[in-house]
From Swiss-Prot:
One of its GO terms (cellular component) is proteasome accessory complex. This is 26S proteasome non-ATPase regulatory subunit 2. Residues 708-903 are annotated as: Required for interaction with UBLCP1. The modification N-acetylmethionine is found at M1. The modification Phosphotyrosine is found at Y194. It comes from Rattus norvegicus. Disulfide bonds: none annotated. Component of the 26S proteasome, a multiprotein complex involved in the ATP-dependent degradation of ubiquitinated proteins. This complex plays a key role in the maintenance of protein homeostasis by removing misfolded or damaged proteins, which could impair cellular functions, and by removing proteins whose functions are no longer required. Therefore, the proteasome participates in numerous cellular processes, including cell cycle progression, apoptosis, or DNA damage repair. The modification Phosphoserine is found at S29, S147, S361, S363. Component of the 19S proteasome regulatory particle complex. The 26S proteasome consists of a 20S core particle (CP) and two 19S regulatory subunits (RP). The regulatory particle is made of a lid composed of 9 subunits, a base containing 6 ATPases and few additional components including PSMD2. Interacts with RPGRIP1L. Interacts with CRY1 in a KDM8-dependent manner. Belongs to the proteasome subunit S2 family. Pfam families: PC_rep, RPN1_C, RPN1_RPN2_N.
Length: 908
């Protein structure tokens, strides 16, 4: 068939094959075969198609004739044919298909035409045809010399193709070639409105992002498209480098403000961490109800604005931002869920389920370590409920079952039980401030700080109570009061509190532990603010300490304070890293890495993660270890345990990978895979840090693959790996009441029944799993996982960095540092109010959140939902939407406290 077809091919006579060299022979035979194939296809064409093909060929030939009067009608007809060819989206329109072989001829005809209307007309047609050719951006070239008629007339596919070519062309032109960019900009100004009007908002955004002109979006957006455009822009933020990410956020923010969507704009201003902008958005909104909603959002994020007193409803707004009602709203939720009954640690341990060989529970002997564990568990489980069975009735009895530092932590747990209840809580703690035991007094001071965590009070009770003890003769008293102040004023950047604390670091009586805790507290108070006084004081303290002092395990808190001060500030840390160069190794590497990872927390910065992986892959030989026996970073009283030395900064690097990647899901998935490798092949220092990193990447989100990994390493031969893995299990399941995790931990409790340290960790993990009886979360992200609370990250980092030396800090005397988690505790609830802020129960659908970025129409945002009546708990990755049209939410993200308005268009 093919042979016959080839013989009959009319084109053959035109081939110059006789004189061509052999390469051309091959080409010509290929051409023949293709032509033969086309001939076959010709035979398959329907009558209609054949007629169309002949007509188009005749039109092209007419353009090649000398009679110019025929050009215009021929071009008109060609254009009509191309435009009217309605076809499926999956195949090339027929006219374009049939004209494709004549593309070269049409270009020749165009070149030979006299300038004028006809020539422009021909350019338009060639531009459309160029879509089917893989030429050198000829679609754009001929568009620019064409008649400049409306883009829309050629259809969507043409506009999309043109947009792609504009973007490529733009990138090849330098800034100097402005004149050549002008016609491209004119085209863009046509393409963007067309895309906006035809449900292709994301294509318009992509084009403007490619040519770095995102600001042009604002004027083309209408009421219907703005939410989609802004959703697309904000979801691109994770994937573009500085400073483009800020430009995208600012563009979306401008769009929201244009349409008076203040809550959404405020959320983006918080993402930018631009406090002036936050204040500007808040004050420029004249709707009091919306302002109250924004005040709730600021309160949740831990931001407090000093409003002028002439602002309408000043007192209400200040009270909401201060989180004064947080405790009463939380207790209302608890009553609604019927979980007010206090729990005792045994309810959590479920010891009656443990099948010991001797019948009943084997470890009934009261040991100070187990009582300490029970103090923490009791605090975690009854957190914020205001009552328990160990401390609130007759606390002294329980406190004296603990020893020394155990008393401090046990007394402080009272603060956790009374969390956020400033007025009622402080009166209950007050009696312990007069105890004869310094440890109990110190714990009570810490409890005062904990109660005030996240809540502002005009009277400043925490400052009034704790300030007298900051320079107390007893270092024990200093610890409680300083850490208490750090927790009470975390994120406030209050100058008066910092002025009180900073001198403690340089005080001659302060032990290394006190200096470290002071640095930590200052870092928490000034978190993410780059406060100059905090930076200079901590740096000075580091410089003044001798090499031996810097080997103390508590020295790690000094650079952590520095890092927290610059949390999320990116390149602002260059000067600090330079200043740290004078410090001797190994402390220098440790401090540098720690400050560096804090600066990029939650940024998802891939380059930083690569640097950290390089640090993780460094290898320290055993010979070096022998020589460096004197260069120890951690002091370790147990000489059998070889302390970590040069590789200490590697542990920080591992934590850093999690800290940077936790911001976006793809990065977190990739980090997860990396951690698997590190656990198998890494140095001991690395392996000890990996469980902590896994905890950070999945806080309060008990994913099975992570739990299984941690469960495996909770039986590791290296005790520190197993301690950290067990604690990490608690962090991953914190506040979820996850049944599978609870069962795992009960099995571990039996497995480690004879090992007090591991058992202590299991108990802590059990307490965390049932945090606030399953109503609280430690996850630093909120508002649909868009916003990272810096205070929460500071609290988590405080604890995790301390766990890098779990044996000396957590299992030593400094377990009080676990209360750093208080800064991250938040209720995971949705409560709805009416405009007068009265609780308003409405039905809501709660289901798994679905990513709807860039989808056409109005797709469903949740799947697999159940309908509940507010107040309701939201798990990780869940989203809520109203199930009734009677009310409209003031903010689109239903989380935390939401104000609802009556829907004016609602008909009963």
């Amino acid at each position: 068939m093919e042979e016959g077809g080839r013989d009959k091919t009319p084109v053959q006579s035109q081939q110059p094959s006789a004189t061509a060299p052999s390469g051309a022979d091959e080409k010509s035979s290929g051409k023949e075969r293709r032509d033969a194939g086309e001939k076959d296809k010709e035979q398959e064409l329907s009558e209609e198609d054949k007629q169309l093909q002949d007509e188009l060929e005749m039109l092209v030939e007419r353009l090649g004739e000398k009679d110019t009067s025929l050009y215009r009608p021929a071009l008109e007809e060609l254009r009509r044919q191309i435009r009217s060819s309605t076809t499926s989206m999956t195949s090339v329109p027929k006219p374009l298909k049939f004209l494709r072989p004549h593309y070269g001829k049409l270009k020749e005809i165009y070149e030979n035409m006299a300038p004028g209307e006809n020539k422009c007309f021909a350019a338009d047609i060639i531009s459309v045809l160029a879509m089917t050719m893989s030429g050198e951006r000829e679609c754009l070239k001929y568009r620019l010399v064409g008649s400049q008629e409306e883009l829309a007339s050629w259809g969507h596919e043409y506009v999309r193709h043109l947009a792609g070519e504009v973007a490529k062309e733009w990138q090849e032109l330098d800034d100097a070639e402005k004149a050549q960019r002008e016609p491209l900009l004119t085209l863009v100004k046509e393409i963007v409105p067309y895309n906006m009007a035809h449900n292709a908002e994301h294509e318009a955004c992509d084009l403007l992002m490619e040519i770095e002109q995102v600001d042009m979006l604002e004027k083309d957006i209408d009421e219907n498209a703005y939410s989609k455009v802004c959703l697309y822009l904000t979801s691109c933020v994770n994937y573009v480098p500085e400073p483009e990410n800020s430009a995208l956020l600012r563009c979306a923010l401008g769009v929201f403000r244009k349409f008076s969507r203040f809550p959404e704009a405020l959320r983006l201003a918080l993402m930018l961490n631009d406090m002036e902008l936050v204040e500007d958005i808040f004050t420029s909104c004249k709707d009091v109800v919306v302002q109250k909603q924004m005040a709730f959002m600021l309160g949740r994020h831990g931001v407090f604005l000093e409003l002028s007193e002439d602002v309408e409803e000043y007192e209400d707004l200040t009270e909401i931002m201060s989180n004064v009602q947080l405790n009463s709203n939380f207790l209302a939720l608890a009553r609604e869920l019927d979980i007010m009954e206090p729990k005792v640690p045994d309810d959590i341990y479920k010891t009656h389920l443990e099948n010991n060989r001797f019948g009943g529970s084997g470890s009934q002997v009261d040991s100070a370590r187990m009582n300490l564990a029970s103090s923490f568990v009791n605090g975690f489980v009854n957190a914020a409920f205001g009552q328990d069975k160990l401390l609130t009735d007759d606390g002294n009895k329980w406190l004296y079952k603990n020893k020394d530092h155990g008393m401090l932590s046990a007394a402080a747990s009272l603060g956790m039980i009374l969390l956020w209840d400033v007025d009622g809580g402080l009166t209950q703690i007050d009696k312990y401030l007069y105890s004869s035991e310094d440890y109990i007094k110190s714990g009570a001071l810490l409890a005062c700080g904990i109660v005030n965590s996240g809540v502002r009070n005009e009277c400043d009770p925490a400052l009034a109570l704790l300030s007298d003890y900051v320079l107390h003769n007893s270092n024990t008293m200093r610890l409680g009061s300083i850490f208490g102040l750090g927790l009470a004023y975390a994120g406030s950047n209050r100058e008066d509190v910092l002025t009180l604390l900073l001198p403690v670091m340089g005080d001659s009586k302060s032990s290394m532990e006190v200096a470290g805790v002071t640095a930590l507290a200052c870092g928490m108070i000034a978190v993410g603010s780059c406060n100059g006084d905090v930076t200079s004081t901590i740096l000075q303290t580091i410089m003044e300490k001798s090499e031996t002092e810097l080997k103390d395990t508590y020295a790690r808190w000094l650079p952590l304070g520095l890092g927290l001060n610059h949390l999320g500030k990116g390149e602002a840390i260059e000067a600090i890293l330079a200043a740290l160069e004078v410090v001797s190794e190994p402390f220098r590497s440790f401090a540098n890495t720690l400050v560096d990872v804090c600066a990029y927390a939650g940024s998802g910065n891939v380059l930083k993660v690569q640097q950290l992986l390089h640090i993780c892959s460094e290898h320290f030989d055993s010979k070096e270890k022998e020589e460096d026996k004197d260069k120890k970073e951690k002091k370790d009283k147990d000489k059998k345990e070889a302390p970590a030395d040069m590789g200490a900064h590697q542990g920080v690097a591992v934590l850093g990978i999690a800290l940077i990647a936790m911001g976006e899901e793809i990065g977190a998935e990739m980090a997860l895979r990396t951690f698997g490798h590190l656990l198998r092949y890494g140095e001991p220092t690395l392996r000890r840090a990996v469980p902590l990193a896994l905890a950070l990447i999945s806080v309060s989100n008990p994913r099975l693959n992570i739990l299984d990994t941690l469960s495996k390493f909770s039986h590791d031969a290296d005790p520190e790996v197993s301690y950290n893995s067990i604690f990490a299990m608690g962090m991953v399941g914190s506040g979820t009441n996850n049944a599978r995790l609870a069962a795992m931990l009960r099995q571990l409790a039996q497995y480690h029944a004879k090992d007090p340290n591991n058992l202590f960790m299991v108990r802590l993990a059990q307490g965390l799993t049932h945090l606030g009886k399953g109503t609280l979360t430690l996850c630093p992200y909120h508002s649909d996982r868009q916003l990272m609370s810096q205070v929460a990250v500071a609290g988590l980092l405080t604890v995790l960095v301390s766990f890098l030396d779990v044996r000396n800090i957590i299992l030593g005397k400094s377990h009080y540092v676990l209360y750093g988690l208080v800064a991250a505790m938040q209720p995971r609830m949705l409560v709805t109010f009416d405009e007068e802020l009265r609780p308003l129960p409405v039905s809501v659908r709660v289901g798994q959140a679905v990513d709807v970025v860039g989808q056409a129409g109005k797709p469903k945002t949740i799947t697999g939902f159940q309908t509940h009546t507010t107040p309701v708990l939201l798990a990780h990755g869940e989203r809520a939407e109203l199930a009734t049209e009677e009310f409209l939410p003031v903010t689109p993200i239903l989380e935390g406290f939401v104000i609802l308005r009556k829907n004016p268009n609602y008909n009963l």
